[in-house]
């Protein structure tokens, strides 16, 4: 009987190990697909703008008006000084953290949940659209999500076991996550309040437990203070200017919750919430304290984030990323709920349902709509601001056409057969239509920096042509005019800001630099009222000759 039982458990574990392997493979693929060709956009430029004009000390002691993550910017500064600053290197820590979460989180919970729950959970983590997105962007949210989860679990294990290794794990994760982004501190420090409350109910042991909490609090406060006090003292005004400026509504919470769960329809959203509630109830029956601990931390920390009214939190995308540390726990309980629902079915049937249900959830989500090749702007809010076009301001407030005829002509060529340099370029995503154009022409795109030939307005993310900056998806007009096109076939010069009814504060003097471009590259091979296109290669000239 014992041998038969062991064989049954081994067979069950083997099946769920296969599901887990599928989840890891899917997660790695989704996070790495076209990873090296993605264009930096929006907040990803904050670090570059800072390191261009600051040294290590200046970076470490300021938060900045346009907030940047201090540790990541220090990392970027190191890369730039050693000739290695590129898009994929900037994003590499987030990529590794996003992949690590799929494996590390189930490993940390291996003694608390059955294999079916952990394998299902890894699948949900792997295909989570917002986690995939943040694993591919040069912002700290993928790292902080991993670190907050580790910190919360480590604190609970330390509280239960009194093992110093868990305490040190908590201190390290809390220090790094808090330094990466202040918004994580409510999640990181709330365990003290919960455990202090439980300690007060322990009778004569309460003072010993409270003393332990106090000691750990001092230990974690020291490195946090060393890292955060200098920028807090220097930039208190900037922080104050960004707090109490946003607002939260029921609608924004609802849309942010749908974003977090990766759906845009009410039915899958309701099903996922119901499964999470069922899973929390099932877990409560076997380990009530852990559920109470997690629910308290998530609820209070999320409430604290919303009550702080940080800037732009009224946008569902902003609120969703600030609350992302809650998501692994929500998906954990949802996975437990799935295990409960399927518990009476045969093992192979349960595993098959989990895999096919995950595939269906992925298909119903946003990613199939933007994983086409090549798409170098997957992080554009056009795809990420809201997964329902009816609520995405990049659909509802900005034009979605018309697409210039030049791009329709390129669409007749094989995908990925030519390379365009699009100039000028705005780091503000709502002033860039390239995601609309690439969806039509399906060719490779590089960003064109037009300084100094066309002026250098700071708002447009212009940076000088230096050895330190080796962004692969950027081309400098000055280099192109020297004949260094680096594989580009067409230079597309946009004459006017886009969209016309949302003009930027400044726009480079394109008309003023066109004579210089024509003198070096020859006459434009295509022009209309909004653009002039120049051939940079023999291949481009051969393509254009067929149009005539």
Where do the protein language model's features map onto the residues?
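Transmembrane-helix motifs of polytopic, lipid-linked glycan transferases
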Residues: 25, 92-112, 150
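Signature aromatic-anchored transmembrane alpha helix within multi-pass, membrane-resident enzymes
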Residues: 20-21, 172, 218-220, 284-287, ...
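Hydrophobic/aromatic-rich transmembrane helices and adjacent perimembrane loops
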Residues: 134-135, 142-144, 186, 270-273, ...
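Hydrophobic, aromatic-rich transmembrane alpha-helices
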Residues: 3, 100-106, 195-202, 267-290, ...
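Transmembrane alpha-helix segments characteristic
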Residues: 21-26, 169, 174, 212-222, ...
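Membrane-interface alpha helices of multi-pass inner-membrane proteins
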Residues: 27-29, 121-122, 134, 166-182
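Extracytoplasmic
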Residues: 366-548
